[in-house]
Amino acid sequence: MPLFRFDTALLLFIHVPKTGGSSIEAALRRMGGRPALLAATTQGYARCTPQHMQAEVLSTFVPEDFYDMRFAVVRDPQSRLVSEFKMRRAGRKQRGLAALSFSDWVAQTFKRYERNPYVFDNHIRPQSALIPERTEVFRLEDGLEAAVGTVARRLGRAMPELPLIRQGTTDPVLVPAKTARNIAAFYRDDYARFGYPAPEGG
């Protein structure tokens, strides 16, 4: 989870995958933040990149009293998983692999998670496991401006331009009722903690 050093504060951004985190990191840089705990690879020593550490691991690296501010952005769990599917589907297409339906991909991915919770660089792990308690949480559905604007005000900085990075496609994905129920069960803690309604069929 990246740290950003400003001249007056040290900020910890809990980067939940597929919630606009790359755009927020770019905005924090534009405000003058210097990043740390941010890498494109695991550097050969870890099971996921540092920006995607779950809360339990994060606490061993960065104690709570080390920084001045902590926030995260969350997303409806089903919407987040659909976004992940679209990204993986595009990757399969580039590699010339056969396309999977969303239902088949979810079933395969949840089985892979059982064997390795770090699958896809910790992208599948529930948001509730990534975000420590007492973290200030914003919803992607309310716009990234809400999160970045709040941080900017507290730092006494101007609101930066918010770039759209890695924006996904808008094509619809069919989510059968059985798959929706499986998603709701897998992410039950996310639905409960962050107040999202369970998906239809869930």
Where on the chain are the PLM-derived regions?
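Membrane-interface amphipathic segments in extracytoplasmic regions
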Residues: 1-202
